[in-house]
Design a protein with these regions (language model features):
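Short acidic alpha-helical/loop segments enriched in Asp/Glu that coordinate divalent cations
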Residues: 33-36, 93, 143-145
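Outer-membrane beta-barrel translocator/channel fold
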Residues: 113-114, 118-119, 143
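Transmembrane beta-barrel domains of Gram-negative outer membranes and organellar outer membranes
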Residues: 2-8, 17-67, 84, 89, ...
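Hydrophobic alpha-helical membrane-anchor/signal-helix detector
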Residues: 3-31, 64-109, 120-138, 160-168
């Protein structure tokens, strides 16, 4: 069942991450982002946003690393933000599309550049395809107690790379610990017990039995 409450939390985290990303991009050299910082500073912020929105979308000349590596990865992270919370592939794609289009391309980024044709297509489409592959891979990692090649450190790191939003929030909520407990219960591992009460000549007798399965 889709977890709408957690999806809103994820969206809030994405908003904070978007602000942080803009700060980092602003600090990069102009040739890394193709933003004309000197000219942008001459135009009021919201006037600049409206100007860019009216002119777009256009085919951009951004660094291919941004367009064809980082944007698909960002799209996969958006997709996983919904998919890992019980949403279908279609619902997760819609969420990815909305975040990449309205939150980013016509949102934060439009304050600095005209919306991009490549980003409007590559981020949600390629990102969702990549995201579904991430989802399948992460499910295998989680089912294996967050281990890869026997290493929980490696498994946890890979899970975070595949699903950074949910894993970051989950680190504060203790989600991994709870998942490991659920895995042990499904396998019949851990401590289990039972109690009993029976009549006797002196009244009632009772007892408790404990079993630990390895």
């Amino acid at each position: 069942m889709p977890n709408w409450k957690r999806l809103w939390v994820n969206t809030g985290v994405l908003t904070g991450a978007g602000v942080l990303t803009m700060v980092v991009l602003k600090a990069l050299p102009a040739d890394a982002t193709a933003w004309n910082k000197r000219e942008d500073a001459k135009v009021p912020m919201f006037k600049r946003w409206w100007r860019n929105v009216r002119k777009g979308p256009v085919w951009d000349g951004d660094n291919p690393i941004f367009n064809y590596v980082l944007h698909p990865y960002a799209g996969a992270a958006y997709y996983m933000g919904a998919r890992s919370q019980g949403f279908s592939t279609w619902g997760s794609f819609v969420y990815c599309f909305c975040i990449s289009t309205f939150f980013w391309e016509y949102g934060f980024e439009a304050f600095n550049e005209i919306p991009s044709v490549q980003d409007l297509i590559v981020t949600p489409v390629v990102g969702s395809l990549l995201g579904e592959a991430f989802y399948v891979a992460k499910r295998h990692i989680v089912a294996n107690d967050y281990r890869i090649l026997g290493s929980r450190v490696l498994g946890t790191a890979c899970a975070w790379l595949l699903d950074p939003i949910n894993e970051t929030i989950g680190a504060f909520r203790g989600d991994q610990k709870h998942q490991l407990q659920r895995n042990r219960m499904r396998r019949g591992e851990g401590l289990s017990g039972s109690s009993w009460i029976a009549p006797s000549t002196n009244g009632l007798q009772g007892g408790v039995s404990l079993v630990y399965n390895f």
